[in-house]
Structure formats: C-alpha cells, structure tokens
Design a protein with these regions (language model features):
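Alpha/beta-hydrolase fold nucleophile elbow
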Residues: 85-102, 106
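Eukaryotic short linear interaction motifs
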Residues: 10-13, 43-46, 105-107, 119, ...
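Active-site phosphate/pyrophosphate- and oxyanion-stabilizing loops and adjacent acidic/basic residues
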Residues: 25, 108-109
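Intrinsically disordered, low-complexity regulatory regions enriched in Ser/Pro/Gly/Thr
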Residues: 28-31, 89-91, 115
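Substrate-binding/catalytic groove segments of enzymes
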Residues: 81-87, 119-120
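Structural recognition of the beta-strand scaffold that forms the well-ordered cores
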Residues: 2-4, 34-38, 96-98, 120-124, ...
Length: 280
C-alpha cells in the first residue's frame, strides 16, 4: 500500500495526477501495490459532523498533529476493501507513506511513532528541523539554474539589497512601485521577491520557472537606456506573473506584524536578502 498525503488541503485535485502520472504510480506498478490519496482531517470532505462555517468551533480541539497522525495509523491497521480477500492491513501488507513539506514532516513522524503501521516513509522537503538562517534551501535552485539566468538574478538581488540597505527612500519607493508593492513594508517586499523561487520548489526547473529565466535573459526585449542592474530589475518587475505571485505571498497582513533583521549571506544564488524574523 502506497499512501500519498495531500497535506493541508483537499485531496481531490491530487487524485488524477498521483494515480495516473507520478513517480508514486510508477512505484505502485513496480511493486504491484495499491495507492491511496489520503486527506487530512478538517480539509476537503474530511470534516467532523456538526462543523460548518457558522458553528462547531469546539470541534477544532480535535485538529491536532497527534490526532491527525493517529488517523493514518488507524487506517493502516484496519484497512480493507470490499471484494478483496487479501489482508491489506499493516500487519500483513507493507504500508509506505509519501509526503512533502508539511506532509513530508508527517511522513517522518509516522515512521518514527508508528513503526508497526508504517513500513517506510518518503519525506520530501520535510521541515523536521527549525533553523533561523536556512540559506542552504537555495543551493539546489542555484545549482540547477542555467548560468546566464543565475547571473541575472544575482545582479538584480545585489542591486535591491544595496538599495534597501541604504537610506535612499526615493529609490526604495520607486522599486516598490515598479513591483506593484507600494503598500508593502520593506520586509514584505523582500518576501515578495522570493516568488520565482517558490515556483522552482513546486515544479522544479520546468515552467513557469523556465519562463521566468527566459523572460529575464531575453536581451531583445530589455530596455537599454539605463544601467544594467537597473534595467534588469525593471525587467523582473514587469514579468507578467510577478504581481500575482507577490500578492499570493503577501496576502496576509501578518507578514507586516513581524519585526525583521536582514542578513546578507554570500552563498546560494547570490548575496540574497535573508530575513530573520522575530514575532512580536
């Protein structure tokens, strides 16, 4: 049994891609296994009786990591399918749990806490360790980004870093305006520039990160009436997806309630502006 955990979201959108076109389906075919797309409690249709938008607030006491982990162990220990005589429970059939990000953390915890139920786990991008200055995160992105695109990104990042490290408020205002981010704090603006790299995390170098690199390195469409770093920054700001991605990353005002200190770390893509936050 190979279980894919949809994490903090409904499972339906994942079913087609996971079952018919994924490395997980390849594993299932290779080992003659069956697949399950698991939906986390309190997401999608996996809601307790009585919970609505208007009522049932007391039920949220059952939305805990421990109880959500126990759901998986209970399923593995008692699973059966009508019409199949084989024992599919974890006592007779190996259960492999697959997840990434939060669900990757769940995969690691399940193997540790329920070894009798989970035979093996595949934990991708699992945040099992808390670290303030996690510059290593960007290393795979740097090493897998074409040299020309990486050079352009470095130039823009260095320029923006220098602008926000100084006291030229006019330049900072101009940059925020170009990125449709005039209402954002300096910290939130820095966060918004991570948008293309979030795309790399989600889908690898394939589109739309590929589109970003091609857009940034298309010299025929770059204005030449200003300095190199300035015109490349303007080019980044005009990338069609930047505004919407920035809005997604900063849709919550919570990011502006954070007191931040910035560090320039000479590693990964460039001296990227790493923001170390201290919650009030």
């Amino acid at each position: 049994m190979i279980v894919f955990d949809s994490g903090e979201g409904q499972a339906d959108p994942y079913v087609g891609a996971i079952v018919y076109d994924s490395f997980i389906s390849e594993l299932a075919h290779q080992f003659h296994g069956a697949m399950i797309v698991f939906e986390h409690r309190f997401y999608g249709g996996s809601l307790p009786n009585g919970l609505t938008l208007e009522s049932g607030e007391d039920l949220y006491q059952y939305l805990t990591i421990e109880q959500a982990l126990a759901d998986v162990a209970a399923l593995a220990s008692n699973f059966s399918v009508k019409g199949i005589k084989s024992d599919l429970t974890s006592s007779a059939t190996p259960w492999v749990f697959v997840g990434s990000s939060y669900s990757g953390l769940r995969a690691a915890l399940l193997r540790e806490r329920y070894p009798h139920a989970i035979y093996a786990s595949m934990a991708g991008s699992a945040p099992v360790e808390t670290k303030v200055d996690f510059y290593e995160y960007f290393k795979p992105i740097a090493s897998n980004t074409p040299a020309k695109c990486r050079s352009v990104i470095e130039e823009v990042v260095n320029f923006v870093d220098a602008a926000f490290a100084g006291h030229n408020e006019t330049l900072k205002a101009e940059l925020k305006s170009e990125f449709s981010a005039s209402n954002l704090s300096d910290f939130a603006f820095g966060e918004s520039l991570q948008a293309p790299f979030q795309l790399f995390q989600n889908v690898g170098y394939a589109s739309p990160f590929t589109d970003f690199c091609e857009y940034m390195t298309n010299q025929s469409q770059i204005s030449w009436n200003m300095s190199s770093d300035r015109r490349l920054t303007e080019r980044w700001a005009s990338w069609p997806q930047q505004a919407s991605l920035s809005a997604e990353l900063t849709q919550s005002n919570a990011i502006d309630t954070i007191e931040a200190r910035s560090y320039l770390v000479s590693d990964g893509l460039a001296k990227f502006l790493f923001l170390v936050s201290i919650l009030h």
